[in-house]
Amino acid sequence: MGRKVHPIGFRLGYIKDWQSKWFAERNYTELLHEDVMLRKIIAKELENAGVARIEIERSANKVEVTVYTAKPGIVIGKRGAKVDELRAELEKRTGKKVKLNIQEIHQPELEAQLVAESIAEQINKRVSYKRAMKQAVQRAMRLGAQGVKIKCSGRLAGAEMARVAWERDGRVPLHTLRADIDYAQVHAHTTYGRIGVKVWIYKGEVFPDQKGQTQLPQPAVAAARPGLTVEEEERPQRKGGRGGRGANAGAARGGRGGRSRS
């Protein structure tokens, strides 16, 4: 069976960037496990804050964590009390100085992670999955998305047999590397079992060399024979010419037949 490559991992280094930015030689595995631990702690503490993604950068003895959220007020807390508590917890678990940055997301309807979490939360509250998917697609397209695709799989509406439901609008070119596609996968835990929610959002094309400018395709140059231009080379042959050659060949064969009879 065919499998789809991860849209973000497929574009890393081209139009997408890594969410962990550091280099290590000997203690690579330790730092990798530390990154996983930091992400789990932040996701647990900020479960209801609408966290879309977490970026981690490292220096010698310092860790810089950037949290992109749709609800910065919940993350920061009253007079910054909650963010200070979170920073202290991260420093205690890592034993390093942690710098915590909070970035606000102004259009959460175009973030695949937040859209998937919203659909999963509605499914947990027994909202119709069809309605949740359709509303999410409509909101994303209304705010400028060029294409949206949502997939829900599992025992939908408590059915005896698991099935897959799709909702889509616009186009989502998965094989175009310059296509800016956001992707997320979330699970909804219901009394009937676990339901998977996948979201693809196509935001337009991004050109690595000239961002913000549309690059027109270069005209193709065909190889022509000496003495002929490209237009003459690509001009199709007339049907009459082929018919004429066929008639001449038939006449030649007929002439040979006449000589054999004599």
UniProtKB/Swiss-Prot annotation:
Residues 38-106 form the KH type-2 domain. Keywords: Ribonucleoprotein, Ribosomal protein, RNA-binding, rRNA-binding. GO terms for molecular function: mRNA binding; rRNA binding; structural constituent of ribosome. Pfam families: KH_2 (PF07650), Ribosomal_S3_C (PF00189). GO terms for biological process: translation. Residues 243-255 have a biased composition (Gly residues). One of its GO terms (cellular component) is cytosolic small ribosomal subunit. It comes from the Bacteria. CDD domains: KH-II_30S_S3. Residues 211-262 are annotated as: Disordered. Belongs to the universal ribosomal protein uS3 family. Binds the lower part of the 30S subunit head. Binds mRNA in the 70S ribosome, positioning it for translation. Part of the 30S ribosomal subunit. Forms a tight complex with proteins S10 and S14. This is Small ribosomal subunit protein uS3. It comes from Roseiflexus sp. (strain RS-1). The gene is rpsC.
